[in-house]
Amino acid sequence: MIPVRCFTCGKVIAGSWEEYKRRTGEGEDPATVLDDLKFVRYCCRRMFLAHVELVDTMAPYQ
């Protein structure tokens, strides 16, 4: 679960997560994808690049 907004600037980022994940999964360069999605601030880019999906890993322990 990616946060809805960037922690630093507050820009809404969650709506672009699925497209980012799909395009990078197809082998496209993450920097190019973020440029196309209009994420130019490094704080927002960090949210995408540093995010790790742990929901599926932690779900069995609930």
From Swiss-Prot:
Main location: cytoplasm
Ribonucleoprotein in keyword set: no
Record field: catalytic activity: RNA(n) + a ribonucleoside 5'-triphosphate = RNA(n+1) + diphosphate
Gene3D superfamilies per record: Homeodomain-like
Database matches in InterPro entries: RNA_pol_su_RPB10 (IPR023580), RNA_pol_suN_Zn-BS (IPR020789), RPABC5/Rpb10 (IPR000268)
One matching Pfam family: RNA_pol_N
Cofactor: Zn(2+)
Example GO molecular function: DNA-directed RNA polymerase activity
Cofactor details (free text): Binds 1 zinc ion.
GO biological process, any: DNA-templated transcription
Enzyme Commission number: 2.7.7.6
Keywords assigned by UniProt, alphabetized: Cytoplasm, DNA-directed RNA polymerase, Metal-binding, Nucleotidyltransferase, Transcription, Transferase, Zinc
GO terms under cellular component: cytoplasm; DNA-directed RNA polymerase complex
Amino-acid positions noted as binding Zn(2+) in the UniProt annotation, renumbered to this chain: C6, C9, C43, C44
Subcellular location per the Swiss-Prot or TrEMBL entry: Cytoplasm
Function description: DNA-dependent RNA polymerase (RNAP) catalyzes the transcription of DNA into RNA using the four ribonucleoside triphosphates as substrates.
Subunit field text: Part of the RNA polymerase complex.
Family (UniProt): Belongs to the archaeal Rpo10/eukaryotic RPB10 RNA polymerase subunit family.
Name the UniProt record assigns to this protein: DNA-directed RNA polymerase subunit Rpo10
Gene encoding the protein: rpo10
